[in-house]
Each structure stands twice: as structure tokens, then as C-alpha cells.
Curated annotation (Swiss-Prot):
Gene from which this protein is expressed: mnmA
GO cellular component, as recorded: cytoplasm
Stated name of the protein: tRNA-specific 2-thiouridylase MnmA
Active site: C92 (nucleophile), C191 (cysteine persulfide intermediate)
Catalytic activity: S-sulfanyl-L-cysteinyl-[protein] + uridine(34) in tRNA + AH2 + ATP = 2-thiouridine(34) in tRNA + L-cysteinyl-[protein] + A + AMP + diphosphate + H(+)
Organism name: Helicobacter pylori (strain Shi470)
Length: 342
């Protein structure tokens, strides 16, 4: 089978390509230029070229920087301006990697596209679903909630049945040169963030703009450094007069540049809504497991569709829901879709 492999210049994607080559597949390597850091691209393209030369496969470099900027990067900035906590990876995957890159791979005559994601594909009644990775500590299915069944059917995740701790030894044994590759340390798993998301925002908007902190009764009780520097649940970086116990951000008013803070129990919610839904065609209202942020523990909840929105009711109090994050719905370890929390 002819398969396109997205190569990032790192160990995981390189070993994914090696695994598929060992299985006898015909491969085409693809490197995506998404963010605007040419210094990073130069290094990672060089790394990807080394992997392709070792495997004896061609490498194509696709420049999607303009598309990425308008569809992902600019949306990231806008979301923070609106007081939300965006999830750019969940937006990038369906539009870039499994959108534009997949389309290109199909034009090359490839039947499928592979990546180093920690996830799996499972066919149920001739329909393809995303399944959680074997390694639950590294599972990335959360970021794949917006993919259509027809797209999922064209995906391959060679690392999905492996444990992260085993991959580097396997990769170095198979491809010794991987141990000599230079890389940049990524922050928060967001490819275009150098040190922190705040540094990225500072390039485009006024981040350090002092404002007031209010309690749930609307009383001014302190100050903060600028609302974009905070997310729901944060407990540091702002002042609260006479506070004897920790206070947490429970709300953000972007228009007024105000934070609303409260105690930990004030972070609790029993329901939430999500828009821009992407759910399986056969989805039925009922009890499922949900995640409202990456790396959170799956939580039981009743999920229903109403007026094109996803509505969730929790059995137990759920803490720290942030607008802009992905709400993802699972049945056991099978991904059924999700939406953006509002």
C-alpha cells in the first residue's frame, strides 16, 4: 500500500515511518511548514531528510503557512482576546494535517496518511472510529474529535499500540542516527509557541494591561496584570486584598478587562454546552465519558443534542471548565466526537 507519512523531524514520526517500511509499504515522506519559524523548519526538514535517506523514501515539503495563519494561528489570538482558552491542535488536525495534507497525499496516489499521533483507528460495523491509544498517559485522541468517518478510514497511527517509554529504545536501535538529532524543546505541545503562549500573544496584542479583580458579588477586591494572562482555574498572578485562603479565576470579562475569582468550590459546574459539534452520525443521547480538557480524567455525564449544540449534565461537580477548550465524548475508549465549549 502507498502511504504518506507526516514527518515532524522527531523520533516518533521517524519511527512511525520505519515501522510502515518494515511492513512492506511504499512510503512518501511529507513535512508541513505551518508556523512562521523558518529556523525551526530548517532544522526539522534536515532531520526529516535524514530519516527519509535512511529509509530510502522521497520527502516533500508542503508550505501551508498562509492557510495555517488564517485558520489556526489568527483564531488562537482572537480566542484569547475574547477571554477564551483555545485548543489550536484540535483545529489544526482536521484542517491542515488531515485536510490539506491528506488531499495532497491522495493526489500523489497514496491510499492513506500516517502520523506519529498516539491514537488508534478501529472499524466497527464497517465504520472507522478513533480509538484511544494503548498508552493512556500519552493518548492524543482528544485532539482528533473533529474528524469525519471518511477521513478516519484513511489514517494510520503506527504508535497507537505501543507505550511511549518503549518507542525511543526501539527507534534508536532501528535508526541509530536519531540519537544525534537536534531538536527544539516545545512548550505546551503547541508548535508555534516558543516559551509561553503569553510571549506569542505579546507579538500581536496588548497583554500587560492592569485591571480589577472582582468577587462573585461584583465587589472589587484586587488587581491583575491583564486578563489574557489567565485561564479558568488559575490561582496565581493576581492580588486579593486580605485573602486568607486561595482564590481561583472562575470567570473572565474580556470587554472590561476584569477577572472574577472565587473559592475552589466556585469552579464547580453541573452542566456545560459546546458548539461547532462534530459527532458520529449514529449518536444518540445518553450517558458517556467526556473530557473537557486535555489530560483530564474521563468523567461520566449525560450528553444530549439540542439546537445544534451539545449539552452535558454531570453526575458529580466538574471543576475548571474553560470556554474555547474542546469537549470530547467517548463511549468506553471509542471517540464519538465533540465540540468547542461556550
Amino acid at each position: 500500500m502507498k502511504i504518506a507519512v507526516l514527518l515532524s523531524g522527531g523520533v516518533d514520526s521517524s519511527y512511525s515511518a520505519y515501522s510502515l517500511k518494515e511492513q512492506g509499504h511504499e512510503l512518501v515522506g511529507i513535512y508541513l511548514k505551518l508556523h512562521a519559524s523558518e529556523k525551526k523548519h530548517d532544522l526539522y526538514i534536515k532531520n526529516a531528510q535524514k530519516a527519509c535517506e535512511f529509509l530510502g523514501i522521497p520527502l516533500e515539503v508542503l508550505d501551508f503557512q498562509k492557510d495555517f495563519k488564517s485558520a489556526v494561528y489568527d483564531e488562537f489570538i482572537s480566542a484569547y482576546e475574547e477571554g477564551q482558552t483555545p485548543n489550536p491542535c484540535a483545529l489544526c488536525n482536521p484542517l491542515m494535517k488531515f485536510g490539506l495534507a491528506l488531499d495532497h497525499a491522495l493526489k500523489l496516489g497514496c491510499e492513506k496518511i500516517a502520523t506519529g499521533h498516539y491514537a488508534r483507528v478501529k472499524e466497527i460495523d464497517k465504520v472507522s472510529y478513533i480509538q484511544e491509544a494503548l498508552d493512556k498517559t500519552k493518548d492524543q485522541s482528544y485532539f482528533l474529535y473533529a474528524l469525519e468517518h471518511e477521513v478516519i478510514a484513511k489514517l494510520v497511527f503506527p504508535l497507537g499500540d505501543l507505550l511511549k517509554k518503549d518507542i525511543k529504545p526501539l527507534a534508536l536501535n532501528a535508526m541509530p542516527f536519531l540519537g544525534t538529532l537536534e531538536t527544539y524543546k516545545e512548550s505546551q505541545e503547541i508548535c508555534f509557541v516558543e516559551k509561553s503562549y503569553i510571549d506569542t500573544l505579546k507579538k500581536h496584542v496588548e497583554v500587560e494591561k492592569e485591571g480589577v479583580v472582582k468577587n462573585l458579588q461584583g465587589e472589587i477586591i484586587g488587581t491583575h496584570k491583564g486578563y489574557m494572562q489567565y485561564t479558568i482555574g488559575k490561582r496565581k498572578g493576581f492580588s486579593v486584598k486580605g485573602a486568607l485562603e486561595p482564590h481561583f479565576v472562575v470567570g473572565i470579562d474580556a470587554k472590561k478587562n476584569e477577572l472574577i475569582v472565587g473559592k475552589k468550590e466556585d469552579l464547580a459546574t453541573h452542566s456545560l454546552k459546546a458548539k461547532n459539534k462534530s459527532l458520529t452520525k449514529d449518536f444518540k443521547n445518553g450517558e458517556y465519558s467526556i473530557k473537557a480538557r486535555y489530560r483530564s480524567v474521563p468523567t461520566k455525564a449525560f450528553v444530549s443534542l439540542r439546537d445544534e449544540a451539545i449539552e452535558v449534565e454531570f453526575e458529580e461537580p466538574f471543576y475548571g471548565v474553560a470556554k474555547g477548550q474542546a469537549l470530547v465524548v467517548y463511549k468506553d475508549d471509542i471517540l464519538l466526537g465533540g465540540g468547542v465549549i461556550v
